[in-house]
From Swiss-Prot:
Protein name: Uncharacterized protein MJ0856
InterPro entries, alphabetized: DUF2096_C, DUF2096_N, UCP037052
Amino acid sequence: MEMGNGMKDARNLDKQWVVLSELSAELVNRGIKVPEIVFEKLRLANALLSYYILDPHASINILANVERELNYVQSQLFSLCDTELTEKYLDRMIKAIRGEINAKFPVSKSNYNREVKKRGKVEAIRVKLQKEMQIERLSDLGEWHGVIFEYSDEKDKVIIEGNIDRVKRALKDFAFMWKED
């Protein structure tokens, strides 16, 4: 599905979402503890934005909710940044607000579970988790990427199932959660 024609304008909130997601990942990569609520709010904002973008009847009022969630996320994340990171991401946020960055928002299509199974070219990869994670948390992450996470019968391992490119992307994005064997 191409952005642009026929897609609803989300007032660049989609671009802001992408920038904040990148910032959260950057903080995690630097070993900084990002509060769980930040990821919950990012997922919520993603779900709301996706619904708004995909559903022609969705009310524009949804965007106010998205904005509220993103403002919260932004204040939480920026409070964890050093000066250099703050400047870098403040600059990106301003560009996002003006629509000057070309960021691809990952539209989340729910009820993907059954689809993934049907769609052929399905890969299943078994990975070892660094620490105990609730399967709910994993299924949220899975939904984000259009893959399915299932606990493996082997201890501390999960199976990621889905289109091979998506599985690779999920592996990369959540690299901080997996144990090197």
